[in-house]
Each structure stands twice: as C-alpha cells, then as structure tokens.
Amino acid sequence: MAKFNLRKGALALAVVPLLALGACSAGGGKTEAAGADSGSAGQAVDTARIKVAMITHAAAGDTFWDIVRKGAETAAKKDNVELLYSGDAEGGRQAQLVQQAIDQKVDGIVVTLAKPDALKDVVKKAVDAGIPVVSMNAGEDQSKALGAFTHFGQSDKLAGVTVGKRLAEEGIKHPICVIQEQGHVGLENRCAGIKENVPGTEILNVNGADMTSVSSTVSAKLQSTPDADAIVGLGAPFTLTIVKSVKETGSKIKVASFDLNAELAKAIEDESVEFTVDQQPYLQGYGSVDAIWLSKVGGFKVGGGQQVYTGPAVVDKSNAGDVTAFAQAGIR
C-alpha cells in the first residue's frame, strides 16, 4: 500500500481546485492518458503514483463527458494519479475496454454502467482480481450488486420525478421525452420518472450519434403531434438541437432538459428552454477518481456502500445567471 502523508493529504482534500483543464470529447474506444503533470496546479500529495482507468459509455462528440473528464483530471493531478480515460457507447466494446484495464493491472477502475448486462461479467473479473471499482453516472441501481464499492451520480429516476413534478405544476399533460440512446437504463429511468407524474408522457427514440437525424426525427414528431405541450431533451447537446427544431417548425411547445452546458445555460436565460436538472458531472469525475485514491492510500470506502448523490439540482431563469460563468469555464 502506498505511503500516505496525512497532513498533505488532508490539505489536498480540503481544496478542490476549479480548473478548466483542456479535454476533448472521447469515444470509439480510444484510450488517453492524463496524469499528475496535467493542468496548471502544483502537485498536492506525495503518495506513490497509481494508475486509474476511467471507462465511460461516451459517444463521440457528446460534450457532457468533457466536463466529467475535467473533474477526473483535476483529481488525478491532486492525487498523483495516472488517469487512463476511454469510452465507447456500445456495451460490448466498453466491456472490452474494462478488460484491457484489468490486463494492464491498473490500481483502480471507474466505470459507467449504462449497459449493466454487458458489463457485469467483466466488472466481476476486476473485483475478483483485487481491483477496486467505482461506478459513476449510470447504473446506480445495479452498482452494488456488480461489485462497485460506491457510485457517484444522481438518481436518474429521482431526476425524472423532479422534472415530472415541475411539468405537472405548469399544467403540462402530453410531454415528449426524447431518448438519444436506446437501452440506456439511466435515460429510461428519467422518462419513467416524468411519466410517473405526467401519465400522458410519450417516448421518442432518436439516434444521438447523428444530430441531423435527431433534428429531422424531432421535427417530424412535432409536426405529427400537435397536441404535445412540452418536449424534454435528456442531455444539453440534444436539447439544443431540439430547440432549433422547435424554432424551424414554428412550434409553440415548451422545452425542458436534463444536464447543463454553457450554451444551454444561455438558452435558459433567454427562455428558449424552461429549465434543466443538473447532475453536476464535474463532481462525478472528480469524486470517482478521488474515491479510488482514498481506497488505495488508506483503505477508505467513500459512501458507506451507498450512492454519493451529485444531483439533481434545478436550474431555471431564476438562477441560470449564477451558473453561467462556471458553465462557460467547462466546470458545469
């Protein structure tokens, strides 16, 4: 076990540097390394260097994962961690990336569980090999059973319920919930939470890997469903595409969202979007890597076997201005 300098470690834990570290959207199975020399802050701990793999279901071009990665890289910088980041939206290929991390004998694995059935066997292999596993972002209901010692993220069902209650309060009767990745348990839970409060909710599946297709599918749905009174995107880039379709079709439908980026924050300020629920992805990346480090240097298990919630937090016109600066820095 790595030697732990308690005084320096405690100081490091007390300060979370808000850095906008450079990152690009990752997908397609590409693995990229970042470590203690990334970013501009000085190294904060003197513990032995460890290697942590973060493997997400990121699709190429989805900027949500840039924010997750920035949080992870900030924690890696602080904790003297070599971070190996990779992602693939297809469950089988994501499982292959986890297997590669096991073969590399990494010191810890952070993994998203959007497709838990595809990942359950390989996550068990990691745990059986003595590699601590933290799950993040998706699959909170399956996390513990699959062997992760904690999970960082929001409850997608609770986030959906939050949106559903807000829509119900506004008198919405027939919202359209747009799922950009079929089979993603977290996205399905979001729509289920909305439907729990607004029974007239309708599901629309789109191909999130092709924004042109998203736009045309949404436009066609708006034109064929004139009684729909709200449409909900399940991620900031998709909601912004929905906004364009609404404007192009001349629809008066209300738009709501999940997640946040700088452009969506501005859209809320100018009332193109009513509100969003933010799951604070920077915290997901940061907390997950930090939890692995804490496990390695002190045997600490963050969360007590339970999920560590990072959301949902409602952002609407009343508070969008407060978060815009952070969103523009790529932190929210």
Model-derived regions: residue spans:
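Bacterial N-terminal signal peptides that target proteins for export
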Residues: 2-13
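Extracytoplasmic "Venus flytrap"
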Residues: 39-75, 79, 84-96, 104, ...
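Hydrophobic alpha-helical segments within soluble ligand-binding/sensing domains
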Residues: 94, 150-175, 213-215, 261-264, ...
